Amino acid sequence: RKVEVGVDVNLAETDPIEVRKDEGIMQRLGRFTDPESKATLSPTAFFRYVACPLRFYFHSVARLQADDEIAEEVDAPMFGTILHAAVQKLYARIVGEAHPGETLRAMIRMGEIAASVEAAINENYLQDPAATTDDYTGNLLLVKDIVTRYLRGGVMPYDAAHDAFTVTGLEQEVAYAFPFRTQGGVTAVKFAGIADRIDALDDGTLRVVDYKTGAPHLEFAGVESLFRGEGKQRLSNILQTLLYAMMLYRTRGVDAEPALYYVRAMNRPDYLPTLDDRETGVRGGRYTLYAERFEELVRETLAELYDPAVPFRQCEDADTCKFCDFNVICKR
């Protein structure tokens, strides 16, 4: 199948690549603002634009698909899927339960974690709910052991020790129509995404929890750096969790605390899942601390996205391109 992507792949390596926004492209972007369209803009897609407008164009406008290879072993995305599915099975037990520490400790003692991890592997990777560990390869047994260790030694003991919360939602859709101004007047982008977990904290605020399997990134150089900093300062996990907190705040009228659960680090006694703002010196800031400037930057970014005079340009930071599905087109 031949796909027209609007890019001359014969350009010299030094030529910057950009795609101008013609009428057809503006119509496709209109899906995210049209109330009649089911299309929504996820926090992941929004960050994709912040990091590299051209990558956003390839993925969300031209809708190019990266080649899906059949993985012989569990890759990083599948590892994350298994972990998320196992957590959801376990935490479904405590939805609505205030101060669930004792229940979590009992689940650890009763050996429920390994069973939930096995069920997650069977359903998501083997796609055979009746499978047993006898069907697991060496790699799959290792994945089972690692996920079990992360949950039994990190996530669940952490929550049991800091249980001033009530889980109110798991894998729950959060959405908000964010208003901003374009040349044609005021419109609204339909943001929507699936929050891993939403907690009600004892002090009356909410917490949006995002489970992460990668290396911890909780420090950032102020909210402005997430949008305009050098490549490595634009931290996707922090920007995205702030977007989820914004959607909760705007739809429920309650402040929200962004929390990143980096599962590989949660066995450390000093682990904190809250954001560490090096610009203000604040650790654990709630959304309203950032709301005014954050929403201003979101509005400016959306105004640029919907400005027909601003083409989709490739990012300047080549490090961003290392793991991009489309770097062959850009020759980076």
Model regions: which residues?
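Flexible loop/turn segments at secondary-structure boundaries
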Residues: 64-68, 176-180, 207, 215-219, ...
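Non-catalytic protein-protein interaction segments used by genome-maintenance enzymes to assemble
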Residues: 169-251
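Metal-dependent nuclease catalytic regions and adjoining charged, substrate-binding loops involved
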Residues: 125, 233-238, 243-332
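C-terminal, charged and often intrinsically disordered regions of DNA end-processing helicases
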Residues: 1-93, 306, 317-318, 326, ...
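Short, contiguous acidic/charged loop-to-helix segments that flank catalytic cores in large enzymes
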Residues: 70-74, 78, 138-142, 181-189, ...
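Active-site-adjacent bridging/hinge elements
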Residues: 53-65, 121-126, 206-222, 271-273, ...
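Hydrophobic, well-ordered secondary-structure elements that form the walls
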Residues: 52, 83, 151, 197, ...
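A non-catalytic, helix-rich entry segment at domain boundaries
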Residues: 85-179
